[in-house]
Amino acid sequence: MIIGIDDTDSNEGMCTTYLGALLLEELQEYGNIETLPLLVRLNPTIPYKTRGNAAVALKLKTDCPEKVIAHVTSRIEELARMECEKTNPGAVFIQDKDYGRLRPVLMRFLEEAVRDVIEIKKAKDLISILGIASKGFKNGRGLIGALAACGAMLDQDGLDFTFEHLAYRQKDRWGTPREVDKKSFFEADKETYPETWDTVDLTNRLVVCVPHSADPVLFGIRGESPEIVNKAASLIRAEPVERFAVYRTNQGTDMHLLPAQNIAETRDMHSYRLEGTVSAAPKTLEGGHVIFAVRDREGAEIDCAAFEPTKNFRSLIRKLVPGDLICLSGSVTSGTLNIEKIEIKSLAPVYREENPICPECGKHMKSSGKGQGFRCKKCGTDSPSKVRFEGDRDLDPGLYEVPPCARRHLAKPLVREERRDMRLNPAR
């Protein structure tokens, strides 16, 4: 049996992965856990998400599915933050005998849930048509993520996955400041990077794997294998851990990105790879946000932004000039593309002008007056105009990313990038 669960948390607390970790232990009373649990991040632009827009799935071999359904439903009722308007839990249950029949349709549903916008009605209609056991609470929006997580569990061989070690706090500490030795996170990063990432942000001197909300998570270490995330976690010095779970996840895979042939294809609440030419110089707005325009081959334009939380990434963006050919990865909201990564494919030349140099003495000539050229007062040599030089761009073609402190869950870090046709510039 595959169990998918979503939308049990709120902005004020709880975490669907914590419920998953509890069920990993509790459901062993009814059977055997067959594989690592799954943590599936969905479309990051959805406005009614609580925090990270994540669903979980568990796979269990059991002879008593009805007891499993009853137990899971009871635990959701007990732990979900039902008082929160945005919290609308959902759970679905896929029987072993239905894996083959449901695999293709739920795999497609997963892709849609990560890259598109799905209405609750579509999930409920699909559940009804396919005869899937389910339980929705309130408006049942969590059924969308629950179905998608089941689709991921049915397609483990076909998807790119990473892993996350999630450590959870003792319940009496929830809502209090986390007690962690920040230095130990930098030590763990030094020991395990680049097989782990987004533990710390070296440039901005921040620990980024420790949340600040009131949820049960103490920290989360992301990496390429269960072994490496467990190794990194073992190096952390912090308050006592109630329990931990290692999730297989689509985090750090760029699964949310769609290829856009042109700007006309882009829509709000979707994420894209988009190629174009810088058409207006970057400008810094109030609040520190950096905005510039990109034009595609058809002549359409879109505003692109490196917002203040991207910190030092904005310095790179400010170096762009009209004519630079780039490829952007990011999400479109309110008609503006929020940049996650930028590939600088080619740089436009920039020029500077200087007074001509005297061929006799090697010093710069002085202006003889408006429209009268230039003359060396010492040697008497003259020249009709300034001399034009190609300037240094202080920027190289290559692939760049926002710093770890600003990276979205689904964005693929450059340490995972396998391309060898360009210079990679991982943010640290």
Swiss-Prot record:
Reaction catalyzed: cytidine(34) in tRNA(Ile2) + agmatine + ATP + H2O = 2-agmatinylcytidine(34) in tRNA(Ile2) + AMP + 2 phosphate + 2 H(+)
Domain of life: Archaea
GO BP term, example: tRNA wobble cytosine modification
UniProt enzyme class: ligase
Keywords: ATP-binding, Cytoplasm, Ligase, Nucleotide-binding, tRNA processing
Subcellular location as annotated: Cytoplasm
GO molecular function: ATP binding; ligase activity, forming carbon-nitrogen bonds
Pfam family, one: TiaS_FLD
Record Gene3D superfamilies: 2.40.50.1010, 3.30.70.2200, 3.90.600.20
InterPro entries: TiaS-like_TCKD, TiaS_FLD, tRNA_Ile2__agm2C_synt, Zn_ribbon_TiaS
GO CC entries: cytoplasm
EC number, as in UniProt: 6.3.4.22
Function per UniProt: ATP-dependent agmatine transferase that catalyzes the formation of 2-agmatinylcytidine (agm2C) at the wobble position (C34) of tRNA(Ile2), converting the codon specificity from AUG to AUA.
Family according to the record: Belongs to the TiaS family.
Protein name, UniProt field: tRNA(Ile2) 2-agmatinylcytidine synthetase TiaS
Originating species: Methanosarcina mazei (strain ATCC BAA-159 / DSM 3647 / Goe1 / Go1 / JCM 11833 / OCM 88) (Methanosarcina frisia)
